[in-house]
Amino acid sequence: MKEVIRQIYTQAKLLGACPLFKGTEQTVEDIVRLFESPRGIEFCMKNHFPNMATFRLFKPHGVEKYGIYIDAGTLTLKDPSRAILIGRTSATIFCSKTERHEIILLHGAKAIVNANKWAVARVQSEQGCSVIKNTSDNAIII
């Protein structure tokens, strides 16, 4: 894992990664924390980074427990606080709790977001991703 992190760091530095990414991170948790930060997501979306081959290296490390779904096929999510869909992932997402739901799509992922009651869903997607938004009651999707 350390070698993979070093490779990602080298590539990210060439693209102008923020100084929060030091290349000394040692665990999947360290990388997830940086990736899920607002600056991390912004950097990855802006630079279409990392590529799918690199994302796939993290799939065996159980990143789904962090709300990151890489080539996960078709799935249904209920009230996720955060869901990051990557690659060949197609999700139907139901948001009904009175809280903020953050949904991020990268590398061609697809989502149908259904928000109702007083839910607030924030959706960010890269070019090439597909999002269908449905709201009812007082819910909003931004």
Language-model segments: which ranges?
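Short, glycine-biased loop/turn motifs at secondary-structure junctions and
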Residues: 1-142
